Each structure stands twice: as C-alpha cells, then as structure tokens.
C-alpha cells in the first residue's frame, strides 16, 4: 500500500526550487519562482520549509533571469514584471503603518504591501446557497483588479518524514506573492504549477444520461437502460 507522500506528491525533487532562485538571509528566504510569482519566508530561527504542505506540492519552476540590487540593510529584486523591496531580516507582519516589504508592478502605480487590504480582489466562489439567509462572504480569490494577490501558506499543515500532516511553527511566515498585472492566464498557470491540477473523476463515473431530478420507477429505469444501451457495469 502506498503511503500518503507517494500518493500526494508526484515527484519529491520538485519540492526544491532551482538553487539560483534563492536569496537567503539570516531570518529570511526569498525564492523567485517566475516573473509573476515570488515566495517570501521569514523565520526568527532561520529555518525554512522544503517539505510539501496541504496546499503546495511543487516549487520547481523553470529558471528565469532577474536582477538584484542590495545594500547592507536593503534588497531589491526586479523580475522584469515587478520589483520587490525588502528590509533584510526584518519581521514580516501586517498591521504596521509603513511596510518593510513592498512590491510594485513595473511601469504602473500598482503597489502591494504586507498590510494591503486587497479591496479590489474579485473573490472566490460559493458552492451552495441552500438555507442561506444572510449575506454571503466569499473568500479571497487569485484575481484582482489591482493585478496582485497574496497567498498565505503559513498556517497550512506540513507533510513530515513520518507521513503525517503536522502543524507548523506559529512564528514563521510563508507567503506566495502573485504580481501578474493583467496576465490572468499566467497567474493561473503559476498557481496550478505550484499546487497541482485538481483531480478529475473518469467521465463514465458521471453517469450515462441527464435528468431533471425525476423520481424514476424501476420499469422506467430499465427502459432508459435499454434505449441508451447502458452497460451493466456502469
């Protein structure tokens, strides 16, 4: 019987990014995954995560060129699509008036900061409105009219060496920043590269005919089966 790791992670080697994608400090690690996507980690202990999480199973993206400008206290990363600026080894947390980390989409005024409320986010979806009487509050989605979205993976469970999902250190930050401007297709492609595509059930499992929730009687089901030449195993 296969363990969870072998079932969940197709290729363990893809959990590690290209070595040229890393910019590492004492308490931070920034990984440039694509021209539109960067991973930002912060840990007081200087410990960074390479194991799969309940959301992320692939951090191996094609190598890209990017440019770094840095001083003793600051680092600036330009991917060609956006520019990220960070005060080295400073805590990454929301709720502060002047952010120590920010990113700007090149050639625009679209700026992200850690405390950005992302009010122009187009939100996600709701699966059902059954028995709903109050206003539905949708979760944040990938797409935003601002052209950026922050995915916080800090609280996701980690799949450890014992094949168990465990909680992470509460003092760490593990963020994925999508800076795509109007390239929505590229954003979605990066997301599915990161998380894997959703599994699809076989087409035959969806059934052999469509109906409007009619209450079929046994004889009617037999008639449909004969008319549609439905196989017994289906």
What does each model-found stretch correspond to?
Residues 67-213, 221-222:
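Catalytic and substrate-binding clefts that recognize carbohydrates or anionic sugar/phosphate headgroups
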Residues 220-234:
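Catalytic domains of carbohydrate-active enzymes, especially glycoside hydrolases
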Residues 17-19, 26-28, 65, 137-139, ...:
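Generic recognition of flexible, low-complexity loop/linker segments
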Residues 14-17, 22-24, 60-62, 69-71, ...:
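Residues that act as N-cap/strand-start positions at coil-to-secondary-structure junctions
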Residues 2-3, 8-9, 33-72:
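A low-complexity, Ser/Thr/Gly/Pro-enriched, surface-exposed linker/loop concept
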């Amino acid at each position: 019987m296969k363990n969870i790791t072998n079932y969940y992670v197709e290729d363990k080697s893809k959990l590690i990014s290209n070595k040229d994608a890393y910019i590492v400090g004492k308490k931070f690690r920034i990984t440039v995954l694509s021209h539109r996507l960067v991973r930002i980690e912060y840990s007081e202990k200087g410990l960074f995560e390479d194991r799969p999480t309940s959301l992320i199973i692939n951090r191996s993206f094609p190598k890209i060129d990017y440019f770094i400008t840095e001083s003793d206290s600051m680092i600036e990363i330009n991917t060609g699509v956006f520019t990220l600026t960070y005060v080295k080894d400073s805590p990454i947390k929301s709720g502060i008036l002047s952010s120590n980390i920010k990113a700007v989409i090149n050639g625009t005024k679209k700026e992200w900061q850690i405390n950005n409320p992302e009010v122009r986010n187009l939100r996600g979806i709701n699966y059902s409105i059954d028995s709903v009487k109050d206003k539905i509050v949708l979760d944040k989605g990938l797409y935003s009219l601002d052209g950026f979205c922050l995915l916080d993976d800090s609280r996701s469970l980690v799949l450890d060496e014992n094949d168990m999902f465990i909680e992470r250190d509460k003092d760490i930050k593990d963020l994925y920043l999508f800076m795509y401007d109007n390239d929505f297709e590229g954003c979605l492609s990066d997301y599915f590269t990161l998380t894997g595509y959703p599994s699809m059930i076989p087409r035959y499992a969806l059934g052999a005919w469509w109906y409007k929730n009619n209450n079929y009687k046994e004889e009617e089901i037999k008639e449909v089966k004969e008319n549609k030449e439905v196989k017994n195993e289906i």
